[in-house]
Amino acid sequence: MIGVLAIIAILAVVIVPKVFSTIASSRVTNAAGSVTALKSTVTEFAGKYGTLPTTVAASRIDDLLLTAGMLESRFVVKIGTQPANPPIVGATWTYAAGAWTAAGGASQATQSRVICLVSNVTAPSAANGANYQLDGATDLPAGSRVISAVIVNATGAEARELSSKLDGDAYTATTALLADNAGKVVYAAPNAAGLTTVYIYIASQ
C-alpha cells in the first residue's frame, strides 16, 4: 500500500506541473490566434472605410470594429488582466460625413484592447504601441498609423512565449526577465511582480 502511494505521489510531482504548463501554453496559443484573426478584420475595415482613426485613453479599435459590424465581441484573450465585470464602457463610435469619431467613455488603460496611434521613434519596448522594428532594427515610417493589440499584465513567461509564436526565436528576448524590442511583439522588462504590458503589431497605414 505504501509503495502504491509513493508511486502516486511521484506521478503527481511529475504530471501535475506538465498539466499546468500545457494549460498555460494553450492560453498563449489562443491569444496568438486572436491577434492573427484581427489582421483580416482590420484589413476588411480599411478596405471599406480607408484609414483607421486614432484612439485615445477611452477609445478602442475593437469597439469600432464591433460598431461597424466586423467583430462579434471585444478583443479578449485568456492571458493578462481579464475584462472587468461589468465591462468598462469605452467611447462610442459614430460614422458621419465619411469619418469615424469617438466620444465619451472611461479610460481603457487597465484593459486588454486594440489601439491605433501615430508612429514615433521611441524604442518599441517603451513606445506603448506607437513604434515597432519589424526587422529588428528599422523604425516604422514617420507619421504612420499603427494598429496594435494590447495585453495588459501578462507574465514575462507569457509575453516571451507569445513573441516566440508570432516572431520566432530571432526576434524574441532570450529570457522572460528582459524587454523585447524586436519584431511584432514588444514589451518592457517585467516589473517586480513579474508582469508587463504586451503590444502586438497588427498593421500600419
PLM regions with names:
Residues 1-23, 27, 37-38:
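N-terminal single-pass transmembrane signal-anchor helix
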Residues 7-16, 20, 111-112, 137, ...:
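Low-complexity, intrinsically disordered short peptide segments enriched in small/polar/basic residues
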Residues 22-63:
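Conserved hydrophobic/amphipathic alpha-helical signal-anchor segments
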Residues 159, 174-181:
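S/T-rich, low-complexity, solvent-exposed segments of bacterial secretion/appendage proteins
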Residues 183-193:
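Short, exposed beta-strand-loop hairpins at the edges of beta-sheets
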Residues 191-205:
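Short, low-complexity, Pro/Ser/Thr/Gly-rich segments in the mature regions of secreted, periplasmic
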